[in-house]
Amino acid sequence: MTSGEVKTSLKNAYSSAKRLSLKMEEEGEEEDYCTPGAFELERLFWKGSPQYTHVNEVWPKLYIGDEATALDRYRLQKAGFTHVLNAAHGRWNVDTGPDYYRDMDIQYHGVEADDLPTFDLSVFFYPAAAFIDRALRDDHSKILVHCVMGRSRSATLVLAYLMIHKDMTLVDAIQQVAKNRCVLPNRGFLKQLRELDKQLVQQRRQAQRQDGEEEDGREL
C-alpha cells in the first residue's frame, strides 16, 4: 500500500469514526429524554413569559388568541389573518363558524371542546395539527388558534402541532410557546400531551434505529 493509499484509508476511517460518534451523541440525547410529570411541566409554564394580551405570535405566522380577537372581524382582516382554528367551537362557547367569516378570505376549522380535565382533546390533535400545517405551508398565510381565554384549549392544540409537525419534544414545545405567551393547559390536557410525547419519542427512536441499521449496512 502506497503512502497516498494509507492517508486515504486513515482519512476514511477518521470520517467514519466521526460520523459514528456524532450519531451516538445524538441518539444518546434522544435516549436520555424522558417525558416529565405534570408538576414539572407546569413549572415550565410558570417560568415562561408573563405576557398575556389578546393575541400573541408563538411561532412564525402562528398566533394564540382569545374570544375577543376571534370576534373582531375588522382586526382580523387588518392583521392579515387567513386561517382561524376555533378550539372552543359551538353554541355555548365561541359561536362563530365558517358563516361568521363568509365575506372574508378566511379558512375556518372548528373543534368543539370543553376546557375540562375529563374532556378528551387528544382525538383532535392530528386533525388540528394538519390544518395548522397546511396553513403555514403558504408563506402568505397567518393563522389564529383561539379558545375563550387563549390559555388552555388553544395552547394545547398548538403544542400538539409543534410536537407532531416540528419534531419537538413536549418540553421544547412548551418552552417555545411559553416564552411568547402566558398559557397553562388544564391537568387533563397535560396528561394527554404527555401521552402524545411518549408516542412520538418512541417513534423517533425507532426511526433512528432503522436509519442507523440501513447506514451500517451501506458501509459494510
UniProtKB/Swiss-Prot annotation:
InterPro entries: Atypical_DUSP_subfamA, Dual-sp_phosphatase_cat-dom, Prot-tyrosine_phosphatase-like, Tyr_Pase_AS, Tyr_Pase_dom, TYR_PHOSPHATASE_DUAL_dom
Source species: Pan troglodytes (Chimpanzee)
Chain residues that bind substrate: 146-153
CDD domains: DUPD1
Broad class of where this protein is predominantly found: cytoplasm
SMART domains given in the database record: DSPc
UniProt xrefs under SUPFAM superfamilies: (Phosphotyrosine protein) phosphatases II
Oligomer and partners: Homodimer. Interacts with PRKAA2.
Keywords, ordered alphabetically: Cytoplasm, Hydrolase, Nucleus, Protein phosphatase
GO cellular component, one term: cytoplasm
Family per record: Belongs to the protein-tyrosine phosphatase family. Non-receptor class dual specificity subfamily.
Subcellular location: Cytoplasm; Nucleus
Annotated function: Dual specificity phosphatase able to dephosphorylate phosphotyrosine, phosphoserine and phosphothreonine residues within the same substrate, with a preference for phosphotyrosine as a substrate. Involved in the modulation of intracellular signaling cascades. In skeletal muscle regulates systemic glucose homeostasis by activating, AMPK, an energy sensor protein kinase. Affects MAP kinase signaling though modulation of the ERK1/2 cascade in skeletal muscle promoting muscle cell differentiation, development and atrophy.
Name used for this protein in its record: Dual specificity phosphatase 29
PROSITE patterns: TYR_PHOSPHATASE_1, TYR_PHOSPHATASE_2, TYR_PHOSPHATASE_DUAL
Pfam families in the cross-refs: DSPc
